[in-house]
C-alpha cells in the first residue's frame, strides 16, 4: 500500500494561526503520512529561529478572549495601543497553564517526524529575508516544486 500524503500551505504569521499547520502536520506524520508544508508570505514568520508571534484579536472578532476580555472591551477597544501585546501575553499564559506546546516545540516535533518544511523562495526574496533567520532544515523552493507534491497528495490544506 502506498504511503498517504498531506500537503499544507501556511500563509498566516500570527500566534493563533501558527498552531494549525504544525498540529496537523505532526499528527499526520505520526499517523504515517508523508507531509510537506509550504510556507509563503506571512507564514514565513513561523520558520524564524526566534518567532515574534502575536494574536490578532481585532482581525478575528470570533476569537474568545481570555478571562472574558471580549466583554470588557468592545471591538473598538481592541484597537487601542498595547492591546494586541496584552492579549498576546494573556493568550500565551493561558496556553501555558493548559499545557499547550509552544510553536517552537511543535515545530521541532515536526522536524523529528520528518515533515518537510519548504520556504517559498519568491517570498523570501520579496521580503529580503536572510536565510540565517530561519531554523535549520528548511528547504527553499518555488510554488511549482510544491505543486508536484500537492498534485500527488491525498489531502491538501490551505491555512
Curated annotation (Swiss-Prot):
The keyword DNA damage does not apply. It is a multi-pass membrane protein. GO terms for cellular component: plasma membrane. The keyword Metal-binding does not apply. Coiled coil: none annotated. Keywords: Cell membrane, Membrane, Transmembrane, Transmembrane helix. Pathway: Energy metabolism; sulfur metabolism. Sulfur carrier protein probably involved in sulfur trafficking for oxidative dissimilatory sulfur metabolism. May be a component of a cytoplasmic sulfur relay system delivering sulfur to DsrC. Binds sulfur in the presence of sulfide in vitro. GO terms for biological process: sulfur compound metabolic process. It is found in: Cell membrane. The lineage of its organism: Bacteria, Pseudomonadati, Pseudomonadota, Gammaproteobacteria, Chromatiales. Pfam families: DrsE_2. This is Sulfur carrier protein DsrE2. Induction: Up-regulated under sulfur-oxidizing conditions (at mRNA level), i.e. when grown on reduced sulfur compounds such as sulfide, thiosulfate or elemental sulfur. NCBIfam families: SulfCarrDsrE2. The chain crosses the membrane at residues 21-43, 72-91. Disruption phenotype: A mutant strain lacking rhd_2599, tusA and dsrE2, although not viable in liquid culture, is clearly sulfur oxidation negative upon growth on solid media containing sulfide, and shows massive accumulation of intercellular sulfur globules.
Amino acid at each position: 500500500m502506498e504511503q498517504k500524503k498531506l500537503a499544507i500551505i501556511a500563509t498566516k504569521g500570527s500566534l493563533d494561526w501558527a498552531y494549525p499547520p504544525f498540529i496537523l502536520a505532526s499528527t499526520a506524520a505520526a499517523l504515517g503520512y508523508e507531509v510537506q508544508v509550504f510556507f509563503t508570505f506571512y507564514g514565513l514568520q513561523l520558520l524564524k529561529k526566534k518567532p515574534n508571534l502575536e494574536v490578532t484579536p481585532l482581525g478575528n472578532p470570533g476569537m474568545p478572549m481570555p478571562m472574558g476580555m471580549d466583554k470588557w472591551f468592545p471591538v473598538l477597544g481592541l484597537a487601542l495601543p498595547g492591546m494586541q501585546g496584552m492579549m498576546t501575553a494573556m493568550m500565551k499564559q493561558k496556553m501555558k497553564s493548559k499545557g499547550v506546546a509552544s510553536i517552537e516545540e511543535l515545530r521541532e516535533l515536526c522536524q523529528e517526524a520528518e515533515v518537510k518544511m519548504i520556504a517559498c523562495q519568491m517570498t523570501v526574496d520579496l521580503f529580503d529575508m536572510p536565510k540565517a533567520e530561519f531554523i535549520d532544515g528548511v528547504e527553499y523552493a518555488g510554488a511549482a516544486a510544491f505543486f508536484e507534491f500537492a498534485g500527488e497528495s491525498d489531502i491538501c490544506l490551505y491555512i
